[in-house]
Amino acid sequence: MKKILAEIAYDGSLYYGFQIQPTKPTIQGEIEKALEKISKTKVKVHSAGRTDKGVHARGQIISFYIRINIKLKNLKTAINSLLRKDIRIIKLKYVADEFQPRFNAKRRKYSYYILNNENHYPWEGYQAYYVKKKLNINRLNEMAKMLIGIHDFTTFSCIKDQTNSKLKKIYFARFKKKNKLIIFEIIGSSFLWKMVRSIVGTIIDIEIKNEPVYTFKKILNSKNRKFTRTTAPAKALFLDKVFYE
């Protein structure tokens, strides 16, 4: 029996996050059900990260064992045929038994989509956070640069987050403009629960209120949750890629 790595993509709109819940639809639950139909036995899926309710992924990584002999291309086809169209297996490969999607990950990349144009089609806001006021991308990037390096992100953590250390290393953070969208891209060692959404919500709030950009640095350095601003909605957040090198 070999361990298999799967790269998966999903639209999280109709799911209560990645992690399995007994009475609610989740990404993990749907994938495990499909694998169990194929293998006729219980299958446990492990992931690189547990995305929240409503969050999407282009490059989530999972691993599992399956107790049947089947070519990977046939297994991929079989799994996708049993999944809803909003969850897709992108690729499969064999990995060593020691491989752990979460603990072997070196970095993770997230993107957050902001719709910043009043003249848009209704569906353009389905997976983007609509902000009516014109945002100054230079000011946004001044604040994004303050994230680079190792920081205590207690300010941008959720009270329910039980992680012992709030220290995280951020390698890259920037806002870029693409047509009607402003896209925030961030790469870090790992992230706290709702951390990216809290960062985005706080930066946008400071920009909308035209506060000095150093306000963001003061909020970050406060290490106090009460100073965080709005938590941006989940529907605009994507887990893009997990890096293992």
Curated annotation (Swiss-Prot):
Classification of source organism: Bacteria, Pseudomonadati, Spirochaetota, Spirochaetia, Spirochaetales
Keyword Isomerase belongs to the record: yes
Subunit and interaction comment: Homodimer.
Reaction equations catalysed: uridine(38/39/40) in tRNA = pseudouridine(38/39/40) in tRNA
Presence of the UniProt keyword Isomerase in the record: yes
Functional description taken from the UniProt entry: Formation of pseudouridine at positions 38, 39 and 40 in the anticodon stem and loop of transfer RNAs.
GO biological process: tRNA pseudouridine synthesis
Keywords: Isomerase, tRNA processing
Family label: Belongs to the tRNA pseudouridine synthase TruA family.
Binding site for substrate: Y110
EC number per UniProt: 5.4.99.12
Name the UniProt record assigns to this protein: tRNA pseudouridine synthase A
Catalytic residues identified in the record: D52 (nucleophile)
GO molecular function, one term: RNA binding
One of the Pfam families matching this protein, by short name: PseudoU_synth_1
Class of the enzyme per the UniProt entry, highest EC level: isomerase
